[in-house]
């Protein structure tokens, strides 16, 4: 017997311990003890003290006294009795005093209730932040509700449960006490109580309930109007919001009239509801009910009958009626409080399940914390399957069944590749301990993940997904998600490394610097790729080459003479002596060129027939177009190396170009190609500018600023060029971020505001912002890039991201795990490749090892159908093209 009682008491104790009110009070004890004490005092202690105080401090007793006084004053007035000034003053003062007490009590309850609701929402937020991914999905089984509705549903359920214990139960106890006291006092007057006076309020209450139900059943809930009351208004609101979200798709597909037709249909249904006959009946019924017509008629009849049978006056009748109504209202409160037990039980189960969700806070308190990374190992028996939360009938198939071991070492680069739905992202989520494996284990430094705290793993691993979430705010705020304490200099450096400033690069600036530094090495007959030829199309000195070999020497002589004469025309009117010297030098150059050409065998000129046809460009064209670029470039501070005495430099430039022409003619077509390749390499080398010039160039390209000076022609002097250059520098606004007292000011990109989800920016730019987060988080020793550059252009990845990323990883001893479908960009830059296929790790090794091992899945991902022995992937592509 004793054991049975002990077991029952233990079960009751555990039940109370697991009740939501107990969990919430324990939460307040750990987080906010002050609020816990206020809650207990306001809801339990103060009402008890007030009830035990004398009548002048008890709300209930003051209320009874005020009701009796009001009836007495009203009766004296109706019977034309003497006016009592003191009774009226006393009634007014007591009413004010009662209102003050009632509002103080209500104010305290509202303050504590608001604080409790806010703490409940914080509890939900804490559970959401520190719980397993998908832990809240049990609330979304029946209805696919959104995050806002989910939070409201959780908070309201918890608040209802907590309010039951903090408000309903204390109010129930107070109602029981008042009902007993008021009922006993009423029974003392039983000899003066007529049955009609007791039945009257009960019958009135029954009538009101029946009238309300009839109106709802017969009028408002008839088949014609049951669904028209509110759903169509909400449907209109949802339709407008959906239209605003998908406006671009609607306009592109010309769905405006279709949408308006649907909206007109909703309007017609809403109007049919408003204009229906049932609406008129309902409004008439409500108007009669609001006037209390039948209640008044019944009250007059009952009053005359009771006063006539009991031989009492109106004052005693009114007093007795108010006392009876007071007891009936207390009984109604008791009935409603007891009825709330049924509703609270459903919330109780849901809230208890929610509050029992474990959080990382409790977990981290007894798990190990890792401070360094030595090895990350994934067992070969690793399996994982997503729980089917929306259908218990369908089985859960494993997404991952690795079947091979994975080992990740420090300071290495890894690639994780596979087809879509091969399990790459799921494996990354397991490595970040966002999910827990169904079978098998992952270990770091020989310690299983189950024994390592999540915060420790997240400190070691930095992860960027393919679709990162962009938070509403500035770009700087979004970059600081990776490290909230990052300095503005670190954010600026990270943004530059992630290509945030490079999404609209200007090639004219690079070409301008290249022309300035390489003008002495250009040959007038050199073939220029089409990417450069548009810069020289404004000049009339471009001559197409021919394939004729018999007159090649004469053509070369004529071209040189024409080019030199045009050059003199472009730089004329400075002084006559310079013109004469130029003409003499031109003649000497032409003679030298003729002699050289006559002594050399003719070489057929290469004429491409493809769309990427090359054009010839001579020295004077380069110099003139260099001036044109300098005047029209809105990207940079101009380089003075291209200025100076143009006429004085023409002779040397002509000689150099003619000599270069001789060398090119000797080398033939192959020499021309090599020269073009050398030129392209020099241009790329010259494009590697300083960080500050890069920042100026990229920021300017973002703002689409144009040059203030007009485009220059060939008639202006060099002095005018320099003056225009100085004016442009003086009028150029300073938009480079200036460090003032350790802070960035007037930054046009980092201070740009983005919407939630990055709706107002491109996908590639959003990926650059998310990628910048890893550059401000140097404490991480493993960086996982899960298709985080899939929407970036190839130039940005090749020329900006990868060099900065690899340098950053090498500097901070970081291991890189790159998930990508662009195998050509990583196959020769990583140390090890993991190949997944349908959740299985089918191949692993370097690119050469996988090619030599005839890794079939890897071949398929490369787009190859069979193995070519003793050939690399690049050779395979070359042979295929041939």
From Swiss-Prot:
GO cellular component terms attached to this protein's record: membrane
Keyword Aminoacyl-tRNA synthetase set for record: no
Coding gene?
abcH4
Composition bias type Acidic residues, residue spans = 715-724
Composition bias, Low complexity: 528-617, 647-667
Q: How does it sit in the membrane?
A: Multi-pass membrane protein
| Localisation per UniProt entry | Membrane
Query: Which PROSITE patterns does the record match to this protein?
Result: ABC_TRANSPORTER_2
- Is Nucleotide-binding among the key words of this record? yes
Q: Which GO terms describe its biological process?
A: transmembrane transport
Protein name as catalogued = ABC transporter H family member 4
List every stretch annotated Disordered. 522-617, 634-669, 710-730
The similarity comment for this entry is: Belongs to the ABC transporter superfamily. ABCH family.
């Amino acid at each position: 017997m004793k054991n049975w009682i002990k077991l029952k008491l233990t079960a009751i104790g555990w039940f109370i311990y697991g009740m939501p009110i107990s969990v919430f009070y324990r939460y307040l004890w750990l987080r906010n003890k002050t609020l816990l004490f206020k809650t207990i005092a306001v809801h339990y202690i103060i009402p008890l003290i007030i009830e035990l105080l004398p009548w002048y401090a008890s709300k209930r007793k003051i209320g009874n006294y005020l009701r009796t006084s009001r009836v007495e004053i009203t009766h004296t007035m109706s019977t034309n009795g003497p006016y009592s000034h003191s009774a009226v003053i006393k009634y007014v003062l007591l009413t004010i005093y009662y209102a003050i007490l009632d509002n103080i009590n209500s104010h305290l309850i509202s303050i504590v209730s608001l604080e409790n609701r806010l703490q409940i929402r914080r509890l939900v937020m804490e559970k959401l932040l520190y719980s397993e991914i998908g832990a809240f999905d049990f609330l979304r089984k029946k209805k696919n509700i959104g995050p806002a509705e989910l939070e409201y549903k959780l908070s309201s359920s918890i608040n209802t449960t907590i309010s039951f214990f903090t408000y309903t139960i204390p109010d129930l106890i107070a109602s029981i006490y008042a009902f007993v006291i008021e009922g006993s006092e009423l029974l003392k007057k039983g000899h003066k109580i007529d049955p009609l006076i007791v039945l009257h309020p009960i019958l009135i209450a029954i009538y009101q309930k029946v009238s309300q139900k009839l109106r709802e059943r017969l009028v408002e809930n008839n088949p014609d109007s049951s669904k028209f009351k509110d759903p169509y208004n909400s449907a209109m609101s949802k339709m407008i919001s959906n239209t605003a979200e998908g406006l671009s798709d609607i306009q592109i597909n010309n769905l405006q009239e279709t949408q308006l037709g649907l909206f007109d249909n909703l309007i017609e249904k809403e109007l049919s509801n408003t204009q229906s006959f049932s609406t008129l009946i309902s409004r008439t019924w409500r108007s009669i009910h609001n006037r209390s017509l039948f209640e008044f008629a019944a009250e007059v009849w009952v009053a005359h009958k009771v006063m006539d049978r009991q031989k009492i006056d109106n004052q005693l009748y009114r007093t007795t009626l108010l006392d009876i109504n007071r007891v009936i209202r207390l009984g109604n409160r008791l009935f409603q409080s007891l009825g709330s037990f049924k509703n609270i039980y459903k919330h109780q189960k849901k809230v208890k399940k929610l509050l029992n969700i474990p959080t990382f806070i409790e977990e981290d308190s007894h798990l190990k914390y890792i401070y360094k990374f030595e090895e990350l190992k994934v067992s070969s028996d690793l399996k994982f399957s997503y729980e089917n939360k929306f259908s218990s009938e369908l089985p859960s198939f494993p997404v991952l069944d690795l079947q091979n071991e994975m080992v990740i070492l420090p300071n290495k680069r890894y690639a994780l590749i596979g087809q879509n739905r091969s399990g790459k992202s799921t494996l990354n989520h397991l490595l970040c301990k966002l999910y827990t494996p169904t079978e098998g284990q992952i270990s770091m430094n020989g310690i299983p993940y189950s024994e390592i705290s999540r915060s420790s793993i997240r400190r070691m691993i930095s992860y960027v997904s393919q679709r990162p979430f962009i938070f509403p705010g500035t770009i700087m705020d979004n970059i600081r998600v990776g490290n909230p304490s990052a300095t503005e200099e670190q954010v600026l450096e990270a943004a530059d490394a992630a290509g945030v400033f490079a999404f609209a690069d200007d090639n004219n600036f690079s070409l301008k610097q290249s022309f300035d530094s390489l003008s002495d090495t250009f040959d007038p007959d050199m073939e220029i790729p089409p990417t450069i030829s548009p810069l020289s199309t404004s000049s009339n000195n471009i001559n197409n080459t021919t394939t004729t070999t018999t007159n090649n020497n004469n053509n070369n002589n004529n071209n040189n003479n024409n080019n030199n004469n045009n050059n003199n025309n472009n730089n004329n009117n400075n002084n006559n002596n310079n013109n004469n010297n130029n003409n003499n030098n031109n003649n000497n150059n032409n003679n030298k060129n003729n002699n050289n050409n006559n002594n050399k065998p003719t070489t057929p000129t290469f004429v491409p027939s493809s769309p990427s046809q090359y054009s010839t460009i001579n020295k004077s064209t380069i110099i003139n177009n260099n001036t044109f670029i300098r005047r029209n470039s809105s990207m940079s501070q101009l380089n003075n190396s291209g200025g100076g005495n143009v006429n004085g430099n023409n002779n040397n430039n002509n000689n150099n170009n003619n000599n270069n022409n001789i060398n090119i003619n000797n080398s033939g077509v192959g020499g021309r190609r090599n020269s073009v390749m050398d030129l392209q390499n020099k241009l790329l080398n010259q494009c590697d500018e300083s960080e500050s010039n890069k920042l100026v160039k990229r920021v300017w390209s973002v703002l689409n600023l144009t040059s203030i000076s007009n485009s220059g022609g060939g008639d202006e002097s060099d002095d005018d060029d320099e003056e225009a250059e100085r004016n442009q520098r003086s009028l150029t606004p300073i938009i480079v971020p200036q460090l003032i007292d350790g802070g960035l000011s007037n930054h046009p990109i980092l201070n740009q505001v983005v919407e939630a989800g990055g709706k107002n920016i491109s996908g590639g730019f959003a990926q650059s912002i998310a990628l910048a987060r890893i550059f401000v988080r140097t404490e991480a020793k493993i960086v996982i890039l899960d298709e985080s550059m899939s929407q970036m252009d190839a130039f940005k990845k090749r020329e900006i991201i990868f060099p900065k990323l690899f340098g950053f990883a090498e500097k901070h001893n970081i291991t890189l795990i790159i998930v990508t479908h662009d195998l050509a960009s990583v196959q020769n830059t990583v140390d090890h490749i993991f190949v997944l296929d349908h959740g299985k790790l089918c191949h692993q090794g370097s690119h050469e090892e996988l090619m030599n091992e005839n890794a079939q899945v890897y071949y398929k991902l490369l787009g190859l159908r069979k193995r070519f022995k003793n050939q690399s992937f690049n050779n395979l592509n070359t042979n295929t093209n041939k």
